[in-house]
Structures are given as structure tokens and as C-alpha cells.
């Protein structure tokens, strides 16, 4: 069995439904991967990276998945600061020989936030596309504004069915990644 330590905010945790109903739990249903869900609601990238670096993972964990940035944007953190956190995460994974998967930001139902999320997404792609496995699950959420409005409870957090769709979409891609 393969293990992935999944770090992030409420979008990893599965808010408001909880980890048992998150998209990471759905990945487990479709693969032979145990998804260790370390998502905590409300955290910014600096908090999440602190936890990644501070707490030792079991020796059998070789893969780290990371999703963050929405709370940073909501709290007014600058793109440079967020990218510094991602660089610290990448450097840590290199140092400890972890394979890194970065889940690209979920585009929301809020246009102001989307401007910032799209900037973050572009910067992540530019900086890490050759260094880490980048996974974009937006197809499972919806690409157009109408689909996104129907996909979210509050403009940011997916409905239960969308978490399920994200997990089903991500499962074969994550399975292929851990088998490399």
C-alpha cells in the first residue's frame, strides 16, 4: 500500500463535511492509496508548511500532497509571501526525499478571489511544473461561472457531490504518480 500525507486547509479537510467525506477519502475508494488527511480549516500556507516541517511522518510515507492559498488570499497575504511558503515546502521535500504533489487552487465562484487564485495558479505552474507533480482538478468542479456557482456551498467550499467528483477525478492521476 502507498501512503500520501495530505496537507492543506479546509479544502483538504473536507469542510463542512469532515475528513471522512473529503475528496481525499474518495481517492482511497478508487485506489490502493491511504490518504493521510492533515487538512486544518482556516490555515494559511505558512501555517501548513510549519506543520509539514515540524511533525515527523512515518518512515513509510514517501509522498506529500499540498493544497493551500485560498485563506492567504482572503487574509490579504501577497503572492510573493505565498510563493515563498511553497518554495520552503519544495526545499523541505527535496531535503527529505519526499515526492511532492501540488494541487492547483480551486477556482471559486467569487470573481475578486479568482483574480488572485489565477495569479497563484499561474505562478505555481511557472515555478514548479518541472519540479513537482501539479494536479489541476478544476474539470471536476466546473470551468464556467455557472458551473462554479452550482458547485460550491459558499463560493469556496465544494458541495458533497463535488468533493466526490474531485476524488474520482484525482484518483487515477494520484495512483499513477505514486507508482512512478
Q: What does each of the following model-derived ranges do?
A:
Residues 14-16, 110-180:
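Catalytic His-Asp segment of secreted/periplasmic serine-dependent ester chemistry enzymes
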Residues 67-70, 89-119:
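Active-site segments of SGNH/GDSL-like serine hydrolases
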Residues 1-41, 46, 52-60:
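Serine-esterase "nucleophile elbow" of acetyl-processing enzymes
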Residues 52, 86-90, 121:
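Generic structural signal for well-ordered alpha-helices
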Residues 17-20, 46-84, 102, 108:
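Oxyanion-hole/transition-state-stabilizing segment in secreted/luminal serine hydrolases
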Residues 31, 96-97, 128-131:
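Helix C-cap/helix->beta junction micro-motif
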Residues 57-61, 96, 177:
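Glycine-rich phosphate-binding loop signature in dinucleotide/nucleotide-binding domains
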Residues 37-39, 104, 136:
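Residue-level recognition of beta-strand->loop/alpha-helix junctions
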